[in-house]
């Protein structure tokens, strides 16, 4: 039975067990991930994040082909042990973990490329947290019908890809949002082959204040269940509401989640429109746990 040195971290309540494995020698089983994330018998988290040198694993070497400066790879695993392409909250906490453990230097205002299964993502340190360029986004997955427990009727959703798949559903009120039981995975028709995160979103009234769009949301994450926050989900929700609102909709958004507030912005680049995410990150405590 080996010991694992870990750090518990969180971003707007989306929490993770992080550990450094530069040489790529610690390959957790699905059962071990589930045990670490168990909130009653383990540490408790929405997922695990391994910091591994990109050169030491195949997915990381693919990131180096994209950007030779992407020295570190974020190996994210969901509660059930399945690998995830990307985590918008996780990558901010991951970057802070690298800084605090002396694995990188990143003064405020500077940017570091991080390898993920969705490709390389650039993370900039700011005075109050981190900003992440999530890259190009796309309408993907069509408009499946979404059935969520305790919502009376099926609702049309909108498929959005921001490096991982999402389906966004607009609701009419915060009361309706509160009624939904996201302990159960919403049912999608048709069901995406790889599954999807599902966001239930309520636009504010008024929607736009001082040029910034405002929305409130909850999320059920594929492989993890309902979480207090989902960074890529916040980006997908803002993109969907902007799409539905039309040409007059803003490119800056404030997204209220149960765990806090995230900022989302859309901006042009040479390879198309990108979406960015901003928010806090915190390392909560360090520890050692025995791996079964």
UniProtKB/Swiss-Prot annotation:
Active-site residues, as the UniProt record annotates them: 87, 230
Keywords per UniProt: Amino-acid biosynthesis, Cytoplasm, Isomerase, Lysine biosynthesis
Residues that hold substrate according to the record: 14, 78, 88-89, 164, 197, 221-222, 231-232
Pathway: Amino-acid biosynthesis; L-lysine biosynthesis via DAP pathway; DL-2,6-diaminopimelate from LL-2,6-diaminopimelate: step 1/1
Localization per Swiss-Prot or TrEMBL: Cytoplasm
Catalyses which reaction(s): (2S,6S)-2,6-diaminopimelate = meso-2,6-diaminopimelate
Domain of life, source organism: Bacteria
Molecular-function annotations in GO: diaminopimelate epimerase activity
Catalytic class of the enzyme: isomerase
Could be important to modulate the pK values of the two catalytic cysteine residues (site feature) positions: 166, 221
The enzyme's E.C. designation: 5.1.1.7
GO biological process: lysine biosynthetic process via diaminopimelate
Main location: cytoplasm
Pfam family, one: DAP_epimerase
GO CC list: cytosol
Subunit: Homodimer.
HAMAP family per the UniProt record, alphabetical: DAP_epimerase
Record's function text: Catalyzes the stereoinversion of LL-2,6-diaminopimelate (L,L-DAP) to meso-diaminopimelate (meso-DAP), a precursor of L-lysine and an essential component of the bacterial peptidoglycan.
Family: Belongs to the diaminopimelate epimerase family.
The name this protein goes by in its record: Diaminopimelate epimerase
């Amino acid at each position: 039975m080996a010991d694992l040195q870990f750090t518990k971290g969180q971003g707007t309540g989306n929490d993770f067990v992080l550990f450094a494995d530069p040489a790529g020698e610690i390959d957790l089983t699905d059962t071990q991930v589930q045990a670490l994330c168990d909130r009653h018998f383990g540490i408790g988290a929405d997922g695990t994040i391994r910091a591994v040198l990109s050169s030491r694993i195949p997915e990381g070497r693919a990131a180096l082909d994209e950007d030779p400066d992407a020295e570190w790879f974020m190996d994210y695993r969901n509660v059930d042990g399945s690998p995830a392409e990307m985590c918008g909250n996780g990558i901010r906490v991951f970057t802070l973990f690298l800084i605090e453990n002396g694995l990188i230097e990143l003064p405020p205002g500077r940017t570091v490329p991080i390898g993920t299964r969705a490709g390389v993502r650039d993370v900039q340190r700011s005075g109050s947290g981190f900003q992440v360029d999530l890259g190009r986004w796309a309408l993907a997955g069509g408009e499946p019908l979404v059935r969520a427990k305790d919502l009376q009727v099926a609702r049309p959703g909108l498929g959005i890809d921001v490096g991982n798949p999402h389906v966004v559903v607009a609701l009419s009120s915060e009361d309706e949002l509160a009624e939904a039981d996201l302990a159960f995975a919403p049912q999608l028709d048709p069901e995406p082959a790889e599954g999807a995160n599902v966001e239930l979103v309520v636009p504010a009234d008024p929607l736009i204040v001082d040029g910034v769009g405002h929305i409130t949301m909850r999320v059920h994450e594929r492989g993890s269940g309902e979480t207090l926050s989902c960074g890529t989900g916040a980006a997908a929700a803002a993109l969907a509401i902007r799409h539905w609102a039309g040409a007059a909709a803003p490119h800056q958004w404030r997204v209220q989640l149960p765990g806090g507030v995230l900022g989302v912005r859309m901006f042009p680049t040479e390879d198309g429109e990108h979406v960015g995410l901003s928010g806090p990150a915190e390392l909560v405590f360090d520890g050692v746990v025995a791996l079964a």
